[in-house]
């Protein structure tokens, strides 16, 4: 069931970030930031963990893809599968799209991988036997992407916004994964001539390690602005999130690498960088102990809020009514997994003078 009540429209066009805070009503952005729900995020993580293992070569992989697709569709966001092969395994990406008002405008993308892995797996049988709950790696990222879709589902930008859950990011027992899903997606986008202004990949964002709410934003020479943009908006809105921006083109172990290789501006958001020692690496990585009780809800919420603020920071209003109430009530039941999603937020903003 999905109920959407909209009492005002919202139309946004893209402008440079350095003028965003003077052009964009800070209160509207703050309202969207406050709409991010830790309860919804943690419920999605729990649901994904409850699948036991989400290895891309298991039957559960298709069940998880269906679960994620159902989330997007229940928000009235157009969503579809993109099928690809990882070795001998047929796997699916889940792609949701909020279309922009300008077909020629570059796209934005939020992505995370939904498969998980246990480091002790050597055969397909091992994969069936050994748990890989993957709460941090990477249910945390997927839950954040789903939450961003919920909060942004009634906004209209000139730019199209994509939300993608990638399959087969992990190696797999036969090493046929290795970011096969994101590579397939990027190859398809390049073939279609799709351009992107910003791609944010979220991978392991929930482990706090006893530190304050934080994230490491890994960029390369083509995407340095994505880190500074996020720092600026988080600071401007007082979001409690410490951000370390690292230009590290040698860190290629997640889906952002597929976008870098295609020349797309992309940033990896991750809780630590083991190559530089920035923050504590999750010691439960790729084990049966990577569970939801090890995660910081506040940190994941802050990351989601920072991304909402960043997206709004590179947008400016075209026109709008004085205010509006948006209510989304979503109930999803797919197989043994269920979730209740409720988005309520009030948007108040001024009409931009021409």
Task: Identify what each model region corresponds to.
Residues 1-24, 317-354:
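Secretory targeting signatures
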Residues 28-31, 40-43, 47, 59-76, ...:
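Extracytoplasmic/secreted proteins, especially bacterial periplasmic and envelope-associated proteins
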Residues 43-103, 242-243:
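A non-catalytic alpha/beta surface segment that caps or lines the substrate-entry region
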Residues 53-56, 78, 84-89, 100-103, ...:
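Solvent-exposed loop/turn segments at secondary-structure junctions
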